[in-house]
């Protein structure tokens, strides 16, 4: 197999990070028990380079190295989203809007089916169920109060509907349970949950399953996106990248995995057995010690892997890691598309990182809004009904409506508009009879039902934006001064002694 581009091969992606000077290779021994995750967490909180741990304590027979923070932010504003851009064959300087447009591009294209190849790098090594013990692998303990060692934070579950018409790729956390089992979170409305329910209804056998780590970066991005039910991600990724993904058949079931995957676990997802799962330090920045529940149980029958394999790891928590840059951002992209499909005048959507991606700010074309002859109350209700009753809005609990003057990709601009234009209560509509996201602390550990309600549309449009247009100017550099004076200030900025 010839060398593949970075967006189609995880190993090439790691090399691309090195070329970008966005990789730190750590060759000294690092303990997977908290130390690797602590370094990665510090990277996420400082937007530093991605760490590649080449010498994990407990490595054996090439299993495995760890790459931390594969989709987190870079320090420089010029290429802040460069790691995500590398997932999609975009320039490292791509904006978030360009990244999300790329992710949405395939929704209007015919899928490009994958190409089945006889073998691939993921078949370079293999272990059957008598040759491995998951508890002896260098699986990271990511937070000190986690309920177990979470092997699955950035891998891709692969399951198929019983009739074979829908193959789903998704990310859902999973931890080591014993020598050949994992337990994980499988909850509605996840696609893996939907397919699990189909197999349970048939009741004939457990769900054939694979978990692939270090998959093509474009594939892991698609796996994070709330694309419509029944859509097979392999074809979506093909359309998005313009090339057919190469897949190989699993050894122990009839599923197919990306040929360049770093590590593949093959087995089954039980339709009857469960096991203790959690707690885990999740995307909203909290862990609740002792908060263990029964989770879905996976049986691992075989492991195949590349030489000197690399396991990607997300050290989830407070800002900013992959759960924010990908889960929140991609939900917002799908919400933008959903609103436009429902003839709502939304031009942009983004989940502000400052909200721990529990909000999505919606930029409204106010000229089209005025043509609708609607009211704030009516518009709030219509937007909330569309978004909160759709899978794309599942993880989002506040929609903030803003005008054309607000850049939704700048959190400080969204917070300014929300704080100064939305009157609490009067300019808001609550939604209590919709599906809620129990992982948000105020849902799962607060007042009220964990799985219902707790959602709101907050209107940060001023009343005149519905009628005659803006009647104010921002008291800022851009709007409070003449163009010639602004240019003079900028031309002389460094000469006056200010930093560039």
From Swiss-Prot:
Transmembrane segments: none annotated. The keyword Lyase applies. Binds 1 prenylated FMN per subunit. Pfam families: UbiD, UbiD_C, UbiD_N. Its cofactor is Mn(2+); prenylated FMN. It comes from the Eukaryota. The active site is at residue 282. Signal peptide: none annotated. Its EC number is 4.1.1.102. It is found in: Cytoplasm. The keyword Cytoplasm applies. GO terms for biological process: aromatic amino acid family catabolic process; cinnamic acid catabolic process; ferulate metabolic process; styrene metabolic process. Keywords: Cytoplasm, Decarboxylase, Flavoprotein, FMN, Lyase, Manganese, Metal-binding. Prenylated FMN binds at residues 168-173, 190-191, 233, 391. NCBIfam families: UbiD family decarboxylase. Catalyzes the reversible decarboxylation of aromatic carboxylic acids like ferulic acid, p-coumaric acid or cinnamic acid, producing the corresponding vinyl derivatives 4-vinylphenol, 4-vinylguaiacol, and styrene, respectively, which play the role of aroma metabolites. This is Ferulic acid decarboxylase 1. It comes from Aspergillus niger (strain ATCC MYA-4892 / CBS 513.88 / FGSC A1513).
């Amino acid at each position: 197999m010839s060398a593949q581009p970075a967006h189609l091969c995880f190993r090439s992606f790691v090399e691309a990070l090195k070329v970008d000077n966005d990789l730190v290779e750590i060759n000294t021994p690092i303990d997977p028990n908290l130390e690797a995750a602590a370094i990665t967490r510090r990277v996420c909180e400082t937007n530093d380079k991605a760490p590649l741990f080449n010498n994990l304590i407990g490595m054996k027979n090439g299993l495995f190295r760890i790459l931390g923070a594969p989709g987190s932010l870079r320090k420089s504003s010029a290429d802040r989203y460069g790691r995500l851009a590398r997932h999609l064959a975009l320039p490292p300087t791509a904006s978030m809007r360009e990244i999300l447009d790329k992710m949405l591009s395939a929704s209007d294209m015919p899928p490009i089916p994958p190409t089945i190849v006889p073998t691939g790098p993921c078949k370079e090594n293999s272990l059957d169920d008598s040759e491995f013990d998951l508890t002896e692998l260098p699986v990271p303990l990511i937070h000190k109060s986690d309920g177990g060692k979470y092997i699955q934070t950035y891998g891709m579950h692969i399951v198929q509907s019983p009739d074979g018409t829908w193959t789903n790729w998704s990310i859902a956390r999973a931890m080591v349970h014993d020598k050949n089992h994992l337990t994980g979170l499988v909850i509605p409305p996840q696609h893996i949950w939907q397919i699990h329910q189909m197999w349970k209804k048939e009741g004939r056998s457990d769900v054939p399953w694979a978990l692939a780590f270090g998959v093509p970066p474009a594939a892991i991005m698609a796996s994070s996106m709330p694309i419509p039910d029944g859509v097979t991600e392999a074809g979506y990724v093909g359309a998005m990248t313009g090339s057919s993904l190469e897949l190989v058949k699993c050894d122990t079931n009839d599923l197919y995995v990306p040929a360049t995957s770093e590590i593949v676990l093959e087995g089954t997802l039980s339709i009857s057995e469960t096991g203790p799962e959690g707690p885990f330090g999740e995307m909203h920045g909290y862990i609740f010690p002792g908060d263990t529940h029964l989770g879905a149980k996976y049986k691992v029958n075989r492991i195949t892997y590349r030489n000197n394999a690399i396991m990607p790891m997300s050290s989830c928590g407070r800002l900013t890691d992959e759960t924010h840059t990908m889960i929140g951002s991609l939900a917002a992209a799908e919400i933008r598309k959903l609103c436009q499909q429902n003839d709502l005048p939304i031009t942009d959507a983004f989940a502000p990182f400052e909200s721990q991606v529990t909000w999505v700010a919606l930029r409204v074309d106010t000229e089209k809004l005025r043509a609708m002859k609607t009211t704030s109350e009516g518009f709030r209700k219509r937007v909330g009904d569309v978004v909160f009753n759709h899978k794309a809005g599942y993880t989002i609990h506040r929609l903030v409506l803003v005008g054309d003057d607000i850049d939704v990709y700048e959190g400080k601009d969204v917070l300014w508009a929300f704080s100064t234009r939305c009157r609490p209560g009067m300019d808001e509509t609550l939604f209590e009879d919709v599906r809620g996201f129990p992982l948000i602390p105020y849902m799962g550990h607060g007042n009220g039902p964990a799985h219902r309600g707790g959602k709101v549309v907050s209107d940060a449009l001023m009343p005149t934006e519905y009628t005659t247009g803006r009647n104010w100017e921002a008291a800022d550099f851009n709007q409070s001064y003449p163009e010639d004076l602004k240019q003079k200030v900028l031309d002389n900025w460094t000469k006056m002694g200010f930093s560039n």
